[in-house]
Amino acid sequence: MYEPVKSLGQNFLSKPSIVAPMVDALGIANGEDIIEIGPGHGILTEILLHRVSGRDVKVYSVEVDERFAKKLFGMYASEPTIEVVHEDILKWLPTFTSDRKVKVLGSLPYYITSPILHSVVKMEVMPECAVFLIQKEVAEKVCSKAPDASYISTFIQTFYDAELLFNVPKTEFTPAPKVDGAVIKLTRTTVEMDRGTIEKYEGFLHRAFSHPRKMLNKPFSKEELSKGGIDPKLRPQNLSPEEWLEFYKVLHSAASI
């Protein structure tokens, strides 16, 4: 058993009873590529293997820690379904391409949850579905709805329906983190955007939520709000992702959306 590296945010699960429902929630089908983020000791990888063995499914297990990558290479060297990738997930995701449906899952390091979520949305092939174990407070924020929306919930829910599946107590991890976790499921909506437009939309939402407790006449001009048919007395958390997207389209005439 390798010692966890604190700088990599490593906290490991050991019970199949927790990770098996994550794999089941992904709804794996033939002809799909599965990306596993941070396999560590391989507990999730092993369950994935049992679910996909003998099927037309490819699993990419992406691990940044050389120790675990070597261990997994040894475990799955003769298994054609599993490809172990020794890479930083934030550098690898933008390079991944596929002509098949893509799904993603993993127990994410809490300290890079937001960058990973953003990277998933900006992938060349946006995943059909994602199942992640993340910090409970962040999970609740990602799944929040108007009038309690946030920047991250609005951004993610423009492209995905977000559902909190179940909580995972911190005592289920080794070493135990300071906070509890929760598993979320993201299911693709019909919204289509290229990466460049997504980044512009991301900047637009950052502007909108730069003063979350202020009314919308703070980040936007009277003319902009009037053009979008937006009540200037509302606050950013009052609008749904659909309303934000329509407002963005009006202001940017985004024909590519």
What are these model-derived regions, one by one?
Residues 188, 207-257:
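C-terminal lobe and adjacent flexible extensions of AdoMet/dcAdoMet transferase-like proteins
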Residues 1-203, 207, 245-246, 256-257:
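Catalytic cores of RNA-modifying enzymes
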